[in-house]
A protein has these predicted regions:
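Residue-level signal for the start and early helices of compact helical domains
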Residues: 13, 46, 64-67, 101-102
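NTP-dependent small-molecule kinase module
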Residues: 68-133
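Short, glycine/charged-enriched secondary-structure capping and boundary segments
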Residues: 11-15, 38-41, 91-93
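Weak global preference for isoleucine
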Residues: 11, 25, 55, 79, ...
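Glycine-rich phosphate-binding loop used to anchor ATP phosphates in small-molecule kinases
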Residues: 1-26, 59-62, 77
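A glycine- and Lys/Arg-enriched "phosphate-lid" helix/loop adjacent to the NTP-binding pocket
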Residues: 18-65
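Conserved nucleotide-binding/hydrolysis micro-motifs of P-loop NTPases
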Residues: 3-5, 28-34, 83-85
Length: 133
């Protein structure tokens, strides 16, 4: 699903209020054009199509909302699916604590550009680890 605006966060917030653990696996792509190509390929093979304006809205809206609301999720996994062969886990968090992260110098441009709060957490963790050495 998509959570490109505040209204779509009502469901995870409701579950959280009721005491459930809320997890998100976020699969990112490098740009909306890559998303368009994947949608076209899916539609060509019998899957559902999505209008280009919705693809763009989903692409940017999802990133904005993740950056703004990542603390809502008890568990968060961010995966780069830009490469069709091998996907890469970029970040794993549990209760806003980093369990795993890709080094900041290896993060894809889309992550750094659209997820500055998560990038800042990685940078802070790297700085902390470097000062402890």
């Amino acid at each position: 699903g998509h959570f490109r605006d505040e209204a779509t966060l009502k469901i995870p917030k409701k579950f959280k209020r009721k005491g459930y653990k809320v997890s998100l696996i976020f699969m990112g792509l490098s740009d909306p054009e890559q998303s368009e190509l994947r949608v076209l390929d899916r539609a060509k093979h019998g899957g559902h199509n999505v209008p280009v304006y919705e693809i763009n809205s989903n692409f940017y809206g999802n990133l904005v909302m993740l950056n703004k609301n990542f603390k809502l999720f008890d568990e968060l996994l961010v995966i780069d699916t830009s490469k069709s062969v091998q996907h890469e886990v970029l970040l794993q968090m549990n209760n806003t604590k980093l369990l795993f992260y890709t080094q900041s110098k290896r993060l894809p441009t889309w992550f750094v550009k659209f997820l500055p709060k998560l990038t800042a957490l990685i940078n802070a963790e790297e700085a902390k680890n470097n000062s402890a050495k």
